[in-house]
């Protein structure tokens, strides 16, 4: 134990184990997805902020979701691309812990916002006359603040739990970025408190959110099926399609990644890493596409922006 340290000066990121020679080529699709995520989510934030007709709870939640996706993808992708293209494998102990916190906390905040959006759909469909009173813009902002505090408080202990561990042997992480489970596996001392708290936090945040989202949609489906006409039922379901797509894009990779981390020890490490990279990029890429395609105001505004840009280019070409 005398040779053990409670911190490493640095950790070494492997990237994709066994495919190090192909890192350069893996960087291009990742950069493309990251660029789409940045562009799409920035557009959503800009349109919701500048279009007064979108200053309603559902779209304010969407703006929050886009901001979270920007932060979540940006917390990892620059380092991943530096690793893949410039072989920048080193990450300091404190930077690793900070990255770990942001990944877990932002995921928890996003989960809370998705729950709030499900509640918005429930009130809008099951209690439409009370929607404006129950969910006004002030309440929406307060919910956003609660989501921020909830995600931060639940996952702030993870870096502190890592700091109490001793690392005696390897400082090599078989991943592209730092997550609690992978850093914990390098520790020499007892990690049971880390395992128990990590699992408890996930169940109390994501587990509870999934349960209440499922309950919301059970009540929504029951209410919609009681509507008299087919067109009314289709219209009511149509208002939920975008949110359902976003929920699936977030929770399906998250659940799959959690199962692989805890029960997939026999799987090739490549599976762990690729699933982790997909989990961080899939929601930020898909969310603005889903809402852009399904929301007329956003779709119209985006098309108008491109039309104005094209008209300016044509005028500039004509003047020359």
Swiss-Prot record:
Organism field: Rattus norvegicus
Similarity section: Belongs to the G-protein coupled receptor 1 family.
Membrane-topology annotation of the record: Multi-pass membrane protein
GO function term, MF aspect, one: G protein-coupled receptor activity
Transmembrane segments: 25-45, 54-74, 99-119, 139-159, 196-216, 237-257, 273-293
Extracellular side: 1-24, 75-98, 160-195, 258-272
Main subcellular location of this protein, as a coarse class: membrane
Protein name listed in UniProt: Olfactory receptor 51E2
SS bonds (residue pairs): 96-178
Glycosylated residues in this chain: 5
């Amino acid at each position: 134990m005398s040779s053990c340290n409670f911190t490493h000066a640095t950790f070494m990121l492997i990237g994709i184990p066994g495919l190090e020679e192909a890192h350069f080529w893996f960087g291009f699709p990742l950069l493309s997805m990251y660029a789409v995520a940045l562009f799409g989510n920035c557009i959503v934030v800009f349109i919701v902020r500048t279009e007064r007709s979108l200053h309603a709870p559902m779209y304010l939640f969407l703006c929050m979701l886009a901001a979270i996706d920007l932060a979540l993808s940006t917390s990892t992708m620059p380092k991943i691309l530096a690793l893949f293209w410039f072989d920048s494998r080193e990450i300091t102990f404190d930077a690793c812990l900070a990255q770990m916190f942001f990944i877990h906390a932002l995921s928890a905040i996003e989960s809370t916002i998705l729950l709030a959006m499900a509640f918005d759909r429930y009130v809008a469909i099951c209690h439409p006359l009370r929607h404006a009173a129950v969910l006004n813009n002030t309440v929406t902002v307060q919910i956003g603040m609660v989501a921020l505090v909830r995600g931060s408080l639940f996952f702030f202990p993870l870096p502190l739990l890592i700091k109490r561990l001793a690392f005696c042997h390897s400082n090599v992480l078989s991943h592209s970025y730092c997550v609690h489970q992978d850093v914990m596996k390098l520790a020499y001392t007892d990690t049971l408190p880390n395992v128990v708290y990590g699992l408890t936090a996930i169940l109390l945040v994501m587990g509870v959110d999934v349960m209440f989202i499922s309950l919301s949609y059970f009540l929504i489906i029951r209410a919609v099926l009681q509507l008299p006409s087919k067109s009314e039922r289709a219209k009511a379901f149509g208002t939920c399609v975008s949110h359902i797509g976003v929920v699936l894009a977030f929770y399906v990779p998250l659940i799959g990644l959690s199962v692989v981390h805890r029960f997939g020890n026999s799987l090739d490490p490549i599976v762990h890493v690729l699933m982790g990279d997909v989990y961080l990029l899939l929601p930020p890429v898909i969310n603005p596409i889903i809402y852009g395609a399904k929301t007329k105001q956003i779709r119209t505004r985006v098309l108008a922006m491109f039309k104005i840009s094209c008209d300016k280019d044509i005028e500039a070409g004509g003047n020359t």
